[in-house]
């Protein structure tokens, strides 16, 4: 993935938080009003507290004071503090509606791009999920902390500086400004020092997670090779490296906090000495000194808040950068993917050729190679110069040795990969057709039967959500699933089914779609012999269907209209069972070997 600088990331995040509707713009205006009013009421409450202290001093010293005035100041202080708290809390609650919209839009867009860019990007599902989860969490933090915490803190600082100047003059404002500037400079320097650990910590964390995931995924291999202790030791070494980096980072954070606290402690002592001297000279009252102390402590709290956000912003932006780079990479892959040039949403159906001798599927000098990657520096050619025609209504079997490219042929028809050469489905050139329209006219079962960990009903109806219940039951029966439905029910989840039962669910889903073209990749390989023959007989009796099957069992070829034999990515033989047996070539040898 390409990287981007921090300013670009910040601009992208700001654009994501931009209001997208009048209601959201009004909500942002209310949030801004909450920020302004909340901090203004906070500063006013500090001044009111000084008046209360002055009144209490008069009671103790002279014994005469307007008690009702003190009560009024106390009531005003209570109202101001309550309003300040109410507005301060309201802004975060209101802004959460914006952050929720941003995260939802980001996640939906990533999922949409991932589905369109599948097989064009190298990222693994687990890695993609980790980046999206971390990135969305950190985007929320950046937006919330920046707009509802950092912005109010800056506004509060401006109000406090103004009030210090108005009430106490430059004599006190200058040292406060100098300390704030030193605080900011020191924080920036320490953040630069801390930044050197940031990337190493992320890399070490990812390395540990990847090591655990790979060990769990390949646990049988680890045990078979007696490498349990080796893997544990290797993981321990990587974790020691990670903890050392995190310890250094914590030390840097500790030094940052220590320096920040020391600066404002010195300022507070300086202000206290000057304030006490002014109070002794009757240039300042006790209440004024209390207000000044409160201002200094409030400035310290605001600077501490900003420093904390700046301290964590680097880590947050790292995950945000990963998510934005992932988004851009998926967008490029989707633009280069199958059917990217076609207006997928604007084409209602896949154009078809006039009836007659038009082919349902036609390959013309088609080649395909998996793209180069870090794992595979040399592109692996899977198909080379493949040409054949499958007529409408034909039942065709594709056979060959493992790795010969049989499954890839079906995947290319489904527009799951880019290819060289021409592929036509019902007379339509794939690259000028809508992927949605082409796939909508095809019922398919891919290798290893992809299913969701949901109910039988959910998986059977997947892609056909409006199918009637009676149709669902009928296709479950046709797929041999009736006994499973009676025993376990339609709401049983996939993990409660065996491999053969899962394959029946895939068959029922394909039958329910009732598409004119069916692509079946070893769709009955896990069924028992009786069920397999029943399902195969049902498919052979389907009228008006073009069926293309990748076969694992050669007994079926005798009942098909034609057989395509693929070897090493090229078509070696094409014909009926009897024709290929007469050639006494590869098909004859495979058939003879299967009977022995």
UniProtKB/Swiss-Prot annotation:
Pfam families from the UniProt entry: ABC_membrane, ABC_tran
Q: Which InterPro entries match?
A: AAA+_ATPase (IPR003593), ABC1_TM_dom (IPR011527), ABC1_TM_sf (IPR036640), ABC_transporter-like_ATP-bd (IPR003439), ABC_transporter-like_CS (IPR017871), P-loop_NTPase (IPR027417), Type_1_exporter (IPR039421)
| All copies of domain ABC transporter, residue ranges | 361-593
Q: Which residues bind ATP?
A: 370, 400-411
Keyword Membrane assigned: yes
Q: Subcellular localization, per the record?
A: Membrane
Question: Which stretches are annotated as coiled coil?
Answer: none
Select a single GO molecular function from the record's annotations and give it: ATP binding
Question: Which SUPFAM superfamilies does the record associate with it?
Answer: ABC transporter transmembrane region (SSF90123), P-loop containing nucleoside triphosphate hydrolases (SSF52540)
Q: Which UniProt keywords apply?
A: ATP-binding, Membrane, Nucleotide-binding, Transmembrane, Transmembrane helix, Transport
Question: Known PANTHER family for this protein?
Answer: ATP-BINDING CASSETTE SUB-FAMILY B, ATP-BINDING CASSETTE SUB-FAMILY B MEMBER 6
Q: Which family does it belong to?
A: Belongs to the ABC transporter superfamily. ABCB family. Heavy Metal importer (TC 3.A.1.210) subfamily.
- Name-wise, this protein is Probable ABC transporter ECU01_0200/ECU01_1410
